[in-house]
């Protein structure tokens, strides 16, 4: 009995399958595409949408822009539309919109430039703003650092400092019942720094006198406003920058001892103006002068540390310079010998810091040499005679005595390098110099450099000297 024939499978319908319908009658979501396939959706109105976007930008009036709610129709408090009213003088109701507008802020220049030496027509004094012809003689170019004055410095008479809820400081003037954000101590400090006939430029004189002598060909001068500038007579130019702060000059000049700091003359007591500087003005001047001296002392200490680091960096390069052909006097001097001993004692070598100096015994191999090359193996010509080792690169006899006379002095200056140089004299020195110099050239033979011969099949079978992993 023959088995019943199965009907052939029906081919899949061409085109996209119709979406399945849920029992509720709504079309279900289309099935997810199989892995590796992408579904591309084509929209017929894409060009129309892009054109509408361009029209909205090019013609904003004709575009359908949604109407915004006017400000009056929004739920805003009444104080949003009314300016604040000036209140009485108190901490709770302090504002700068009241009578405090009489004190206009003044920008004090911190760094000068040749094009901005003239100040404006008005200047800030202790009693307020003075403008007009009377302010012209008192208009000076002030140098002032942009740092906050510490809280321990006392305020002028009639002033009080308070803080807002956010922690910002403001100042209360009980004399005229005003508040301000500006620190009145800065104005007082700027008045003390104004150069007058009695005390011309005390901080600048202190800074310049403690910096050491000027380089050759330089001269220091001062303008009518008390600004210090420098004249270079070599190329006939002027500069606002101090040439002593140039790192090239600091490297060339060896500072053996710090320059003595000249104490400034005592400031003449100034008469208080407007009742702000009261009877405690002399104490305030002394405190401000003490702060300036402390700042100058800290600046000099940092500068001295920087110069000391530069000096150590230069001296650390002396051994390499001496080996390349430097002079003997700079190394064999007693002062430099003591400094080299100090530097090597402070180095990171455990043998040099242990106290008992490490001394090398006399060596019979080629471990000690005048050359900087290292030999991984004993040369083949080491046991041959001197005549057979003539490679044509012998060291000239004129340079050997200078090396023999220079290196013992330098090696004796370093602790822990008690080297016996007896084996480096005469023929042994010549043998070692001839032997070590061409050792690097022997290692790089022509067979290594010839890539084609190494990669050739016959070369790999017969004369291969490489180990392939």
Swiss-Prot record:
Gene Ontology MF: a single term: proline-rich region binding
Recorded name of the encoding gene: Yap1
Modification Phosphotyrosine occurs at: 373
Family: Belongs to the YAP1 family.
Organism from which the protein derives: Rattus norvegicus
Principal localisation: cytoplasm
Protein name, UniProt field: Transcriptional coactivator YAP1
Gene3D superfamilies with a match to the protein in the record: 2.20.70.10, 6.20.430.10
Residue(s) carrying N6-lactoyllysine: 75
Domain of life: Eukaryota
